[in-house]
């Protein structure tokens, strides 16, 4: 076997070793892209109830992850308070969650945040408030953005992702209209 043959054999051995060394216990990346089934992570509502993203199936849901200290989250919540009636009449439930640990910054509790920025609309039964688990936070916000939202169809598939809500509201409302028109509401 010449040098070329030995080199080819060495490459084959290295590729084989690398392929066989992949751990089957390594965490898998869970897709949060459009079309994917939303990963089933947990959160705690302000009423103290543990819930999962999977438990939201059955109707379209806007899952919005926020930090309670960011100004665009404040403005987005105020804007969403003006649209909650429209979203509810379209069959969309809103779940607004504080990112775990408020991404390491100090901000008001999600309950105080809701009252301050959503006002009376914070008590709307079509708007659930809570705190994301650490795993939900890292799964849905791996880049550590101050806010990000996901529109889920009634079967729990992600149909739209964007941020920040205050400046992308028209896109969100358009996505809701398309979801409703397509019979996924």
Model-inferred region functions:
Residues 65-82:
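Conserved redox-active cysteine motifs that mediate thiol-disulfide chemistry
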Residues 59-61, 66-69, 101:
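Short pre-active-site segment immediately N-terminal to redox-active cysteine/selenocysteine motifs
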Residues 58-61, 89-95, 124-127, 147, ...:
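Loop/turn elements at helix/coil->beta-strand transitions in domains of secreted/extracellular proteins
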Residues 145-185:
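Thiol-/selenol-based redox modules, centered on thioredoxin-like
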Residues 91-107, 122-134:
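Thiol-based oxidoreductase modules, predominantly thioredoxin-like and allied folds used
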Residues 1-38, 184-185:
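N-terminal targeting signals for export/organelle localization
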């Amino acid at each position: 076997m010449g040098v070329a043959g030995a080199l080819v054999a060495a490459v084959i051995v290295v590729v084989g070793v690398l392929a066989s060394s992949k751990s089957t216990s390594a965490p898998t990346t869970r897709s949060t892209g459009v079309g994917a089934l939303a990963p089933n992570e947990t959160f705690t509502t302000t009423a103290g109830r543990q819930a999962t993203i999977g438990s939201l199936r059955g109707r379209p849901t806007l899952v919005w992850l926020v930090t309670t200290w960011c100004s665009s989250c404040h403005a987005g919540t105020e804007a969403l308070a003006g649209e909650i009636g429209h979203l509810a009449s379209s069959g969309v439930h809103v779940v607004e969650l504080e990112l775990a640990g408020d991404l390491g910054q100090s901000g008001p509790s999600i309950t105080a945040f809701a009252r301050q920025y959503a006002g009376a609309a914070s008590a709307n039964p079509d708007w659930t408030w809570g705190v994301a688990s650490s795993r939900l936070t890292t799964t849905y916000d791996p880049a550590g953005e101050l806010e990000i939202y996901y529109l889920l169809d009634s079967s729990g598939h992600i149909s739209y992702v964007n941020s920040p809500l205050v400046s992308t509201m028209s896109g969100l409302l358009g996505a809701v209209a398309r979801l409703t028109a397509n019979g996924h509401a």
